[in-house]
Swiss-Prot record:
Keywords: Acetylation, Disulfide bond, Glutathionylation, Hydrolase, Phosphoprotein. The modification S-glutathionyl cysteine is found at C22. Its physiological role is not yet clear. This is Acylphosphatase-2. GO terms for molecular function: acylphosphatase activity. The active site is at R24, N42. It holds the Pfam family Acylphosphatase.
Length: 99
């Protein structure tokens, strides 16, 4: 992965109709396409949560996708981002679905 610019890390939680609509699978695919690492999982309260890490521009692209696009049959009401920070190195080697 090219590290043009600072590396960023951000936590996210997506609200809406995001479970049972292949949201995690599409999130993993989009993350790999953009070139970010991290993870995604369903929560017990019906949301999807996770973390994204990578070059700032790629993290911003993923944030936009998590806020506006999602999987084809999902309906995103809102996405909360928290704990956004600059990191010195990536903590993950890929993007994965957690269970």
């Amino acid at each position: 992965m090219s590290t043009a610019g600072p590396l960023k890390s951000v936590d996210y939680e997506v609200f809406g109709r995001v479970q049972g609509v292949c949201f995690r699978m599409y999130t993993e695919g989009e993350a790999k396409k953009i070139g970010v690492v991290g993870w995604v999982k369903n929560t017990s309260k019906g949301t999807v949560t996770g973390q994204v890490q990578g070059p700032e521009d790629k993290v911003n692209s993923m944030k936009s996708w998590l806020s506006k696009v999602g999987s084809p049959s999902s309906r995103i009401d809102r996405t909360n981002f928290s704990n956004e920070k600059t990191i010195s190195k990536l903590e993950y080697s890929n993007f994965s679905i957690r269970y």
